[in-house]
């Protein structure tokens, strides 16, 4: 509500390990910003749900002044959402966008009923983003922009607390083959039909050229990567978008720093030697996103 009224968004950053969490929280403290730490099913498979929740609980103890949510990103079933709700997540996303409208409504309602009974909020998705990221993969030909009228009906039928819509972003590092595009008219229409309601943008990494170039400079092959320009995301945040998801930029920032460190220090075999600059790269990148993209600096 505060973000909607203030015409800014809150950054939702995907986490997989300790260094990412530490970097994000340090940046949030510096910029005095709320933050959403989100774990995908892939992160749960990689680190284990108990480890992810445990690390974030420690972060909450270290940064009690920072409003922080622990969110499930792209939960693919009621069972996954239930496990996360029971395991300590404060927010979950059920992604039923691959299903028919009716089936998406049915399962989302089940998740909402269970979550709300436990004091947990629910994000849902209507429309399909193209791209590949983690366990989510959608061909461009199967991408579907969100219908504003259906969005309003969906929220009314399900009672979900926020809605991820498709207006031109996509998952992964290769978002556009042509010029970047966001359908602001569609977003505005959704906002008119759902006043004072938080909209979510997935696939919103900028794919920062500095990190792409550094990855390639030090042995990587990240070729043809293109993201969403920052000014386009900022405009969306001034409209109805209250949550902006960022994953790929974290991956690129960390990988660029690790590649550079290993290249410049070939004698080092201590993981801390390259994970420390990776953590610092995350901190700097998140600081920039908070201030220049989502606009949530100094809102606590």
Predicted regions and their residues:
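C-terminal alpha-helical cap/extension of soluble enzyme domains
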Residues: 217, 222, 228-300
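Alpha-helical and His/Cys-centered functional microenvironments
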Residues: 206
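N-terminal amphipathic alpha-helix/helix-capping segment at the start of soluble metabolic enzymes
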Residues: 1-11
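Generic long, charged, amphipathic alpha-helical segments
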Residues: 200-203
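Alpha/beta enzyme core
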Residues: 1-2, 17-43, 50-65, 74-198, ...
